[in-house]
Each structure stands twice: as C-alpha cells, then as structure tokens.
Amino acid sequence: MSLRFIYGRAGSGKSQYCLNSIKNRIEEDIDRPLILLVPEQFSFQAEKNLIEVLDEKTGFKTQVLSFKRMAYRVFNEVGGITAKHMNESGKSMLLYNIIEDNKNNLKVFKKAAKRQGFITTISDIITEFKRYNITPEIILNNLENIEGDNLKYKMEDLALIFSQFETRLHKNYIDNEDDLTILVEKLNKSKQFDNAEIWIDEFSSFSPQEYSVLEKLLLKSYRINITLCTDYLNQGRFVDTTDVFSPIKNTENKLLQIIEDNNIKLDKPIALKCDPCARFKNSAELQHLEKNMFSFPYKEYKNETKDICMLKTLNQFTEIENTAKDIIKLCIDKGCRFKDIAVITGDLEGYENIISSVFLQYNIPFFIDKKREINNNPIIVLILSALEVLSKNWTYESVFRYLKTGLLDINNEEMDILENYVLANGIKGYQWTNDKPWEHKSFSNYELEDQALKELLAKINDIRYKAMEPIVTLNKNFKSIDKAKEFCEVLYEFLCNINLPDKIQNMIEDFKVEGEIEKASEYNQIWNIVMEVLDQIVEVIGEEKISLKEFFKILQTGFSEYEIGLIPPTLDQVMVGSITRLRSHNINTLYIVGVNDGIFPSPLKEEGILSDDDREFLGDKGLEIAKDTKSIAFEEQFLVYSTLTTPSKYLRLSYPIADGEGKTLRPSIIISRIKKIFANICEENDIVKLNGEEEELKNISSAKPTFNYLISNLRKDVEGVKIDNIWGDTYKWYLENEFWIEKLNRLIKGFDYTNQSKYIETKKIRNLYGKPLKISVSRVEKFSQCPFAYFVQYGLKAKDRKIFNLSYPDLGIFMHSILEKFSHELEKKGLEWDTMDLNWAEEEIDKLINEELDNKSLDILNSSKRYEYVTKSVKKILKRSIWLIGEHIKRGNFKPSYYELSFDIDGDYPPIAMELHSGEVINLIGRVDRVDLLQKDGATYLKIIDYKSGIKEFKLSDVYYGLQLQLLIYLDAILTELAERSGINGEPGALLYLKLDDPIVKNTVDMSDEEIEKSIIKNLKMKGLILNDPNVIRDMDNIISGISDIIPVMVKKDGGVSEGRSSVATKEEFETLRKYVRYTIIEICEEMLEGNIEIKPYKKKDGSSCDYCIYSSVCKFDTNIRGNKYNILIDKKDEEVWDAIKKKLEYKNI
C-alpha cells in the first residue's frame, strides 16, 4: 500500500509517463492488475492513447476506468444494485411531484417553487449533497447549530424535500449519484483491485465521494500513482489561494491526510522537468507562455511571435470568418489535419450558429461538442402542445404550435387556409369543439361568389375536423381517468393513432439519404426518450392521482432535463466546443474565440439557493459542501492556464469589439496579460481595411466564400472603384468552371437589377382600375403618396392577412357610424345640438352602441374584458364629442345641415365628374361627415367638418403636393351643386378637422368644473382653413377675443384677423385652391391611367409614406438599389405655397 505523486506542469508529459509506466509493467510481466483511472470524458481518448503505446495483444492487460465504470465492474462482480437507475429526467419529475405535494409545508421555497428552473436547482443541490456525503439525517441533526431563521428554514425545506426524494426514489429506483457511495461499501468484497497498481490521470480535484473510493483503493492496492499538474511540492501544506496551482495543492493535501490517517506509505514522487516541456518542444513561444502566464514577476519575450497570434475583429461574424480562412491556410500551407485543430469559446451558445454557417460555407468539416436539448424537437413540441391545447382550452398559440410540427396529416396549404380563418375570426375555446360548422364569412380579403365561398367554407371545416379529431379523442379518453399511469397509457395510444412511430422512422431514413447524419441520430434517440420518460412516470408515481395540468407540467419537467449526446460522424474534423469541455491534449492548433471580458474567463456564477455566506457558515459547522463562488473564481485561473497550454504548435486568441447587435465588447484581461509577456506578438485586425495583393489573397480560400468576395469586387468595378488585378484572374477561374459559370453570369446580370417598373400598358391598367374610372378622393391622395403602393392596393388588390382585432381605422369607422345615427336621431326628434338635453344624449349614445353590439355588427367588442374596456372608452369619447359639438354650435350661427353627405350614383349628390385632357370623364366618390350652413347677406356659407379619431393637421404644403385634397374637392363640389341645382350663391366658410377624443386634464384639484370644460375645449381645438372674414369668423365663435379656443384663428384688438397667427384664406384664395385641386386631381388621374406604377414614396422631414406602408416586403424599396429614390417634399411656408400654386395655374392658363 503506497501513494506516489507524479508532478509536472502542463505539457510536461504526465499522461505519457503513465502510459510508458504501464508498458514497462507489462514488459516486466509482473502478475498484478494494472488500472488507468481517468475522468469519464477522457476515457475514450485514454483508451486510444493506450492502444497507440501498447499493441492489440498487450492492450487488454490494462483496464481504462472512470469512477462510474469502476462502480459497474464491482457491482457485476459482487452485486449491489438490484433496482434500475433513475436519470436526471426521472429525478426532476419526482421532485416536481414531491414539491407539489408539500408546497404548503415549505417555509422559504413556497413561492420560488412556481418559478421556471426551480426543479433543476433543487435537483442540483441534492446531487451536491450526495457527492459530499450529506444525508437528510445529517442536515436535520445539524439544524440546532444553525443561527438565523432564513438559513435554518432553507435547510429544513431542503431536508424535507431530500428526505421524501430518498424514500420515494428507493422504492423502485436508485440514483446515479448513489453509485459511488455503494461502491465504497462493496469494494471490501471485491478482489479486482487487490495488489493492483493504479495510475490516476487528468484529475485536478475530487469530490468527497471520490476521496472515499480512493481511500478504499489505497488500502487494497499495491500502489496508486496520481498525476498532479503543478510544480514539485516541497513547501509544506500551506496553500496560497491566489496561486494558479492552488486547486491541485488542495487536492494533494487531502490525499496526504488520507494516507496519514490510514498509515499508508508515501513513495518518493516523480518530478517531470519542463525544459522544455514535451508538448512544447517545437515551440519556444508556447513554452514561454506556459512558464510566465501566471508567474510574478514574468519574463518578457522579445522576439516576434509566429506560434501565438491575436486577432481583433469588427464583430463575431468576421471573427469566425477570419478563423475559417486561417484554418484553410494552415491546412494548405502547412499540411495541418482538421482533426488536430480545435475551436473553443466561453460562449458556445452565442457562437454556435455563426460557426456552423461559416464553416459550412468554407467546406470545413466540424463537430460541435455539446449536448443538444430536446425541447425544440418537433416530436417533443407535438406531445407538449397537444396537452397544452387541452390544458389551456384551445388557444390559437397552442393549436398551431401542435399543427405546425409537420407530424400530422395536414399539408402547408391546408394549414394556411385554416390559420387565416382562425385569425380573422378569433376562433378559440369551445368554437373548435362544438358540432356546429364554422360559417363566419369574414376571413378572406377577396370577394368571392356565393358558391365559391360555400366551397371554401366546406373545405375549411373539413380541415378543422381532420386537425382536431385526434385531440378531441385524446381529451375524451383523458376525462375518464385520474392516475398518472393511465395518463401515460392514453398519451401512448394517441401517439400511435397518429402513426408517430412510423413517421419518425421515415424521417430518419430521409435524413440518412440527405446525408444529415446528426439529425438522423437525434430523431433515433427521441422516441426512446419519450418511452423512457413515460415508463419512469408509471414506475415512480404511476398510482398517484393527478390532473391533466399536473401531467403536462410533469412531462414538461421530464423532457427539459434531457440532452442528446451525438457521436462525431468522422475522425478528420475540427472539434468545436466550450472551454470547460476541452477534452484532449492531442491538439496541435487551438483557436480561442470570444476572448472578451465576461466570456473568458467566465464571470462569477450566481450563488444559487445557498449563498456564499451560507456555505461558509455550514462549512464552519462541519457540513462541507461545494465551494463558494469566490473559491470557484480563483480556480478559474487554473482553467485559463490549462486552456492556454493545450496546443502543442499554434495558439490564436481572437476578440470582437462588438456583438451581433453592435454593443461594445471589451477584450479580456488575458489579452492584456499576454501582450505584456510578448512585446512583439503577432497581432492582426480586420477593422482597418488594408489594400494590396497580399491582403486580397487572404480572401481567396474555398470556392464559395471566394465567390462572394469576387461578386463584391466586380460590383465595385461596375461602380468605377479600382480593384486589384488578382480578381481578374479569379474571375477567369470561375468562368472556366462548369459548376460556377451559370451562377456567375446570373449574378453579373443582377448588377443591372432594379425593382422599378415605372409604367405598364394602358390597356392592362384599364382592366385593373375599370372604365370609366370611378375613384374615391382618398385613393387619389394614396397615389400621390406612392404610385406603386396604390397599384398594389387597388390594382392587384393585395391586402394584409385579416386578424381578429380592432384597429384604429375600425374604431374610427365605428365612431363615425354612431355619430351619424345620433345626428339623424336628433333630426328625427326635432332637437338641436345647442339645446339638447345632455342626459338624454348620453343615454342615446349608450343605446346606439349597445344596439350595434347586440346586432353583432362588431363582434370583437364583446370578445374579451379588454374590449369591454375599449367599448367603455368609446362611449366616453362619443359622449365628450357630442358635448363638444354642442358647445361649438352654441358659440356660433352656423347650423348642421348635412350628415354623411355622399357623392355617388345613389348618393346625396352625384359623383364629382372631371374631364381629363383626353376628353374622358372620371367620377370621384366620397363622403363628408358634416356640413354646417350659414345664411348671411344673401349668401350661403359652408363649414365642412371631418371627424378624426387621430391627430390631423391642415397644411397648405400638403395640398400643394396632392396629399390633402378631400375637404377642398368636397367644398368645390357642394358649391358647384348649390349653384347649378338651386341657384344658391354658396361661399366657402371653413374646412375643419374635429378630433374625437376624451382628453385627460392634468392638475384638476384646484380647478372648477367650468375651468376643466374650458381646458377640454381648448385641447380639442379644431384644425383647418377659415375664410378670412371677421364677420364670418364671429359666426363660428361669437365670444372670440384674441386666440380662439375652438378654431385656428386669432383676432386683433381692432377686430381684424392676425394672419400670421391664423389659418385663413380670402375668398379669392379659396377660389384659387378650388381650381388648383381640380387641376391636381386631373393630373394625378392621368398619371394613374397612363400606367405609372413607379416605386416612389414621398419623404418629408417628419417621415415618409413608407413608415406605415404594409407593402414594403413587396416593393423592396432601398435607396441602395439603382433607380430607388424618394420623392422629396420640402415643407413650404404658406406664402411660398400660394406663390407656387398661382405660378402653376398661370403656367397652365387655368
């Protein structure tokens, strides 16, 4: 019985020494068991290395074991395990059930138990207790020593959960974490390790469980040799926590304590020298890094480096692209093999997708060494979403998550049809399962004949029944059961009924044919995982009564703990992984990417359930558990040391200055440390672009990425930018390659691409728009905003997918409708706005809105509590609006005369006819919300009012550009009709926008009701254009003094109008505007009928017509594309507008 330490720094050859020692023992033919004990993740590599040192005939004489493998060997020899092992998934499901049963008994964790991830946290701490040989009884026996209620209650909760977990677990199962505890007991009976010589390699520390196993092995074996990655120790047992080797020295001290307690001999240690280290014999730079990275003071390396390089990049994508180029260069120039290269990072999740994308493009074979979560696998999504449909009562999200897994007998076209219908009509809950066919007609944006509509509805109902039938059956079967075991049986029947096993098998075969071996391997494991989870539920809680929601949660918990490990499909490939999972020292070349602050070294971990203070206190009381975050942070430097000393030939560290979102990233402290040690380190960056053939050559590597660089340079050449001659040679290579020539020619043609199609044939446009042209004034304005958007909306009739919600336009239409009905009700009853009873008016508004809701004309307002609130708000707004209208009318002499005055064939007035220069007549249709009239001095003055639910300003500049034409053309049409029909001398009075709102008045505590009303009136002041006539103005606001609070006018003390502070126009100016608007509409309509569909949105200083356009995905407008330019509209002052309008009319002789 003896222990021997093998000391050596990283790369000194400790592992090789072990292998050589084993070989020597075999050659000496000593009859003694030979064991190589390594961590589980190193076992495959250790076996491979051992075979390389020995041969096939002698290799079998040595066993390569991990602690887990050792346990299984002993159990097979002497017995010990009669129950099955429960995996992490089963543990989590059991813990979920225990916590649910005991949630009311928990003192600290009652609320936390509901949080996502809590089960995993509890599972982790139970694992920690077991590895540190702590039982529920030990926790309970130490409770009296714990001061402070918070920690005491925590430990009581943990003891309760842990105790019940142990009791219920051991009925049918055993925990994987119990294996080493049982191994310690069974080693006494085992003969396998009697007089054995054991070599222990690649460990930096051990858990208390493992120390107990080692103690037993020391008592049974001839000798244990253990490698320690450190200097030769001769300074006693004192450990400086800041020393890079402090974790190793702690390990040595614990082993020394064990042999001291058991009177075991300590053999003379082996100290491997490192001048140079075996690993770095061909690289003085890597040798220097190993010696000085954590030496204080360090020795500076003066020469320029070639084996250690740094790369500073613009972002993570360019970082990986540069890494790929360097790998290709190494393989071509230096004959490096992919299998000798590793790319590692402290943020594998953030880099994984980028690495996959770039390496595939560069044809670099790679394997990402990580376990895959299964929660996003379609099979798991199908199972969980099917249960979610039932537990959440057929919500849209759960139903279509289930349907979109691709594992059901519904194709994509059927799915789209069904989804469009469901979204348009807000289908949810019982609407899915009742027997009545769906008959809503509000689901298509396109007008269909009755027969076509019936056929489409029939098809939708067929798809609906096909989609819901399996889940309806599942729900029916669930309703008659209440035990966990029965839920599992019913779910299994459901999966078989939808032929899931056969579908999975077909998918696996398809993946294999397509060469997607990793996908095939993943799907091959998933079905077995599902069965394993169901089996464990049956065996652990099978007889317990649970609800459907609990079953869903238990399954969700079980699946969340599973991770799939995949085997590398080939040997010659780049290994990509996390820094913490770096498994092999047989790496020549190592790329560490993302060497940024907070990534490598990794930041401090969260303290978890037990804080650092808790752990320190428990340790002082004799309850030793895992290290606190501070100790782990000190150990992180040993991980840094181990990582940096892994490669034998070449090391490159790279760091981006920004992440994918453009947020600044700082370089790690490792970067600055290495720069100090290596004053002339090889350092590159891709931030400052250098010119020259040598730099351009770096972009020529694999065919696909080089092709992308070639296209980029050819575009520069087309744009007149000088490019390097090397791209001419590259172009010739692709031209002579059959595989690339077609792609090359196609992309070169793309240099002339434009998304513009400025005009289409007049005949075609007539067919689209109709003849004669009948068009609303708002559509004319739409054309002015962007001809292409108009063409798509009214020519192609493309519309947004209908969604069951209430948009602002919908709300505006609804409020207009109620106001119209209210206005007609006033007329019918012979009431006036300025004298009506407000209580009656408010009751009438309530009645009209309730009638609309009862008639289901706006179903959505009855569909949820949220929309009930919206309805209340609408009622408040309309009540405020009728009060406001009444106040306006009280203040003047204009009287409401027309409501919803329409211009159409069957309207109040005929369509507004306009003759184009070709002689063709177009008909404008539209509707005016309200027209007030004033009889004065033999003339009839018109005040046209447009109700708006949002903010609307009147701008002469917008009139000039054709963006604001409606009120003026209506004014012109009414004045014309009055003159021609009745011989009435009509005059313009005002064009106004009235906002429908119920504004909040702030600081009302000290305000009287009258002051509040004044504030509201002022807040809702109308915008528009008023006739510049003081008398007419007073007929709109008879109490005006200074600035009016209802119309956009200010009068001076002498009674005149302050034109600079008012929005006014003279009678002559109104006449000018009437002419200009007619001329503008004719010009716009002629452009329209000539086939102008140019993508030319307007742009002003406050925005563009693209801001809220729903057709941006159709036009692909981009100022970088040739021919794509905004129609820049400069906001003109009113004086400038008047001048411009007059000049244009004079030029056109109008």
From Swiss-Prot:
It holds the Pfam family ADDB_N. The keyword Acyltransferase does not apply. The heterodimer acts as both an ATP-dependent DNA helicase and an ATP-dependent, dual-direction single-stranded exonuclease. Recognizes the chi site generating a DNA molecule suitable for the initiation of homologous recombination. The AddB subunit has 5' -> 3' nuclease activity but not helicase activity. Belongs to the helicase family. AddB/RexB type 1 subfamily. Gene3D superfamilies: 3.90.320.10, 6.10.140.1030, P-loop containing nucleotide triphosphate hydrolases (3.40.50.300). [4Fe-4S] cluster binds at C786, C1106, C1109, C1115. Its EC number is 3.1.-.-. Its cofactor is Mg(2+); [4Fe-4S] cluster. GO terms for biological process: double-strand break repair via homologous recombination. It is an enzyme of class 3 (hydrolase). ATP binds at G8, R9, A10, G11, S12, G13, K14, S15. Despite having conserved helicase domains, this subunit does not have helicase activity. Binds 1 [4Fe-4S] cluster. This is ATP-dependent helicase/deoxyribonuclease subunit B. The gene is addB. Heterodimer of AddA and AddB. The keyword Metal-binding applies. It comes from Clostridium botulinum (strain Langeland / NCTC 10281 / Type F). HAMAP family: AddB_type1. GO terms for molecular function: 4 iron, 4 sulfur cluster binding; 5'-3' exonuclease activity; ATP binding; double-stranded DNA binding; helicase activity; metal ion binding. Keywords: 4Fe-4S, ATP-binding, DNA damage, DNA repair, DNA-binding, Exonuclease, Helicase, Hydrolase, Iron, Iron-sulfur, Metal-binding, Nuclease, Nucleotide-binding.
